[in-house]
């Protein structure tokens, strides 16, 4: 092609792109795929909607009754539908809170090590250990704490023992959340800080951590939501109490899963109402924590 021909071609209008219509076979495949994925979504949604409907229908009467959120079951007879779940709600939040106080610093320091410092064999061993710990069943964690904390060291069953088991369940979630958020921080920010002579530890504290903090907090809340409903640790490591126990190191302490398990043995109708009311209360607690995590992510995204 000569140069003059090329120049003349530039003066010609651009031909519109012509798309061939979909063949009948491709339209059928597309319709089948769309129907399949939509049906899969509906099938997956049905059990969730059914579960929520049953729990709300059977537990709504209890959670809307006066005193449900502000009273315990102290002095309440099994056949009486009185009192509330204040003691169990308090125990659930205290056990999860103590576990978070122990697991969050350890998990975040582990995440910082893996992202900022870990490059050798120790880093690979730590990553493998976290992966294994993420798959440990809650009953195994409870039995480990029982054998070490109670059978070997001689401490008694308590809410603190439950918190130790919950730490083992929370730790891998906190580590993974912190690790993912720290890796999302651009390396250019670290390099700019190093170029100004800022030490690595101060770069992590002043630059990397504040940027990753919204995602880390969201991950922490999700880890708490993951453990508040665990039943095995409370069955193995602490006894049930009808009243509030403020001492986490001594005595029995109720929780929502333990209340549900205890009231299942109550043949009276009041026990039936308390079981479903406690189940709905637990769902409300978990949903509230997840909603808080979603709001933190949303606010952090808007600010960016």
Swiss-Prot record:
Its main location: membrane. Residues 89-297 form the ABC transmembrane type-1 domain. It is found in: Cell membrane. One of its GO terms (molecular function) is phosphate transmembrane transporter activity. Pfam families: BPD_transp_1. The keyword Transport applies. InterPro entries: MetI-like, MetI-like_sf, Phosphate_PstA, Phosphate_transprt_permease. GO terms for biological process: phosphate ion transmembrane transport. It is a multi-pass membrane protein. The chain crosses the membrane at residues 36-56, 96-116, 132-152, 155-175, 204-224, 276-296. Keywords: Cell membrane, Membrane, Phosphate transport, Transmembrane, Transmembrane helix, Transport. GO terms for cellular component: plasma membrane. PANTHER family: PHOSPHATE TRANSPORT SYSTEM PERMEASE PROTEIN PSTA. Belongs to the binding-protein-dependent transport system permease family. CysTW subfamily. Part of the binding-protein-dependent transport system for phosphate; probably responsible for the translocation of the substrate across the membrane. This is Phosphate transport system permease protein PstA 1. It comes from Mycobacterium tuberculosis (strain CDC 1551 / Oshkosh).
